């Protein structure tokens, strides 16, 4: 066998689905002799980087080499036991959950559950999460997660502003004990909207009618807890909305905040079984009153019924969201933290209410006994009721912190943000991992600093303690069966498997969602995130302990800069929506630095992602729409006209490239020039960057700032709806304005304040993208983009005779995705795009993106990871559906009672004793021949969406209890 005939076993060949032979066949099908000729026909010549010039990315390598390299890097982190607290706590992820959820591609490769009939498993897990949060907080409405606690608090301000009774009120009061990173994000979110933030002391609380809301932190950053009843009542007398940021483990013991009268309760579920991971990702929560259900941000899982009357779950009240309401949306949140919420929900299922209470009581016990030890050693402490933390201000603080570090413990440096050399005090926060031996060790450290003899604590009796100064939980909670019947590992393992078997993920087949880039998430990429050297690190740990993380971050920033043609990158935004927000704020700050803060017009094409206008409004801009022409391109004349009209106030153009219509617009460079001539900046939505990596670089054709979706282009899994990472890359003149942080130094010299709670966002999953880029290398990344474009064009060519491709470039080609026009089917035969989407489930596929960016269409994106047989299987499915439609057209199939209108077909339906449909069971269930070997079954029939919104149920009782009720 010659060298040329040897199989390529590099990672590149593992990641890219089509073989070289497949690639040649696809090129031949399209009429091209080689890939270079094809790509040069797709990419406009003026932006095509034909030689991959200037991209300084290492050559690709195999998985073992990359794992060895990143393992060496991980060892550069110093793994100390963190007692820092401040919203980040050590916890134990039960192995049954780690093995069966976190490490299970059935869970982490799924997409947001828009196609509910094939998403019932994670919808139930999220329904359990919402039930948990509602039970914790005492509020009836909870969402299915937000990005972090700071973002959730900021969203609470937005809701409070929206529903305020005094529309002239513009002040928001914040507890002075708020977590500093939360305050940082609140400042970022409030300033563009003209909201005045003022701090308050709960011992000296004053409020007036110019205040539309207040935020209380319980416990405070020092661990203190207190009864908020009077302040809540005083706030309500002035019609102010009350938000409480609560520690969920403390809330296990304390009377639910909703019973105190809180209107909104937010927090982070990180303590419920999710590693610290250098700041994230973690699932935040947001609960509120029934009256605000249509203003709540993020996604809500609600109960409905399918066409057969069976209970089913779905995403409810979607008309609130950015993909529908655009600049009028309640929030710009798109990606949230579904996988992390699922982990936390199973953590609660695993422990049950008794187990959670035991963990919380242990924290209180250890904190109380540690306080006694401090007093016995004559450390000066302020006596107050606290949940998990003790702050000590003393002259020996630096010595205590240093000695603790030498013994493997990180304490909180006071004041927060100081170096230990300048410490005025130290703080200790206890958590689920605290044990007797840890208290003994801390006692030895503290006694040594005081020069006192260490007493033998081996016989020390740890006295139980309870919280004081605040009412405790009295009513039973989490009585739903799901939280009380799976404490056995066998039962929990089976329950987890039962749920995930209802879900369609990349394990079952291609997910051809346009604008979503559902590519392979390789196992080797995911392995490092569970290593303790990455997963246990606190985001505010000493700089000297973080060398490994800083190397990962520096590598990624340099690689992403090289790939995009920009000069600076911030990894802080923890979702694409937050990347948009950060990028626009950077532009806004740059204008302000030039004395042009009046520039507030943001031009956005009508085809843009819904997050674009929502983010623009959040950033303080006014949105002006730009038309698109009949070919799907931005109307250049309309762009010029709008730019001239608004020239004095023009701030930015937001554009997606390739366009959301699936084509490389030939005049992108001219569009940038038009905006620059009028003093504006150009923002690129990087959702479609998978068609550009290694082929063209936005920074080289006129873009000023763009965000990148690491959970799309750079292989971080979607997790069923998060986590995501949305870094921004900027041109040289914008580098000084990259986001900073109040505790950890990062960002530019003139940095905007933080957009995420952690300084580097969801840093715990950055090793995934590091591994992807390291293994693919420059050539592999370029090849991936080329194959992604080739696969989309192959699908478009095969399907065009059956479903016209709506937009093509002058060469008849598309970018990495294409839009199939189904509108004639509705006008002629009453076939809805939803009918085709649901019928695809019977064929064994997740539907493409439906009715976006054009109503009545399907947007298809295959990615480079899908093999030619899988592409052909999808084409066969779509052609098979078209043939069924033809049978309806010819009158051979009933226009209502047919496989499309009745889809999807469940196993229960096709095995029922009653079958009165004019088509066979086989036609319903096995439309393709190979499906008899393997079949993925939807677990429910088509869901009644309207019923679910009219009869909103988004928390307890659990699904099992509801089934029990209905069976009576």
Curated annotation (Swiss-Prot):
Entry EC no(s): 1.4.4.2
Listed GO biological process terms: glycine decarboxylation via glycine cleavage system
Keyword Oxidoreductase: yes
Cited InterPro entries: GcvP, GDC-P_C, GDC-P_N, GDC_P, PyrdxlP-dep_Trfase, PyrdxlP-dep_Trfase_major, PyrdxlP-dep_Trfase_small
Modified residues (N6-(pyridoxal phosphate)lysine): 712
Reactions mediated catalytically: N(6)-[(R)-lipoyl]-L-lysyl-[glycine-cleavage complex H protein] + glycine + H(+) = N(6)-[(R)-S(8)-aminomethyldihydrolipoyl]-L-lysyl-[glycine-cleavage complex H protein] + CO2
Keywords: Oxidoreductase, Pyridoxal phosphate
Gene Ontology cellular component list: cytosol; glycine cleavage complex
SUPFAM superfamilies named in the record: PLP-dependent transferases
One Pfam family here: GcvP2_C
Superkingdom per UniProt: Bacteria
Keyword Oxidoreductase: yes
Coiled coil feature spans: none
Gene3D superfamilies in UniProt: Aspartate Aminotransferase, domain 1, Type I PLP-dependent aspartate aminotransferase-like (Major domain)
Cofactor(s) of this protein: pyridoxal 5'-phosphate
Subunit and partners: The glycine cleavage system is composed of four proteins: P, T, L and H.
Function: The glycine cleavage system catalyzes the degradation of glycine. The P protein binds the alpha-amino group of glycine through its pyridoxal phosphate cofactor; CO(2) is released and the remaining methylamine moiety is then transferred to the lipoamide cofactor of the H protein.
Identification of the protein by name: Glycine dehydrogenase (decarboxylating)
Higher taxonomy: Bacteria, Bacillati, Cyanobacteriota, Cyanophyceae, Synechococcales
Gene name per UniProt: gcvP
